[in-house]
From Swiss-Prot:
Residues 17-54, 67-79 form a propeptide. One of its GO terms (cellular component) is extracellular region. The lineage of its organism: Eukaryota, Metazoa, Ecdysozoa, Arthropoda, Hexapoda. GO terms for molecular function: neuropeptide hormone activity. This is Neuropeptide-like 3. Keywords: Amidation, Neuropeptide, Secreted, Signal.
Amino acid sequence: MFKLCVFVALLSLAAAAPAPAPAPAPAPGLIGPGIVAPGIWGPTVVGSPLLAPQVVSVVPGAISHAAITQVHPSPLLIKSVHGLGPVVIG
């Protein structure tokens, strides 16, 4: 009987314990806006202003005939992607 009482007491303590806090989400804008492009092994982030602030033109290997231009510190602008037609992000 004593063991049952101890078991019930421990069980009630475990049930009353607060749940562990979830992991904090990364702050928005830490990496900056980027372009997620289709890649050979899944979606690929082509670039962002924070990671590549001086990039003027990027041609990733995963996208054929892509012309990507950055305008000042604003998000990247895709002029055209072969096979997808004209795409503008900005």
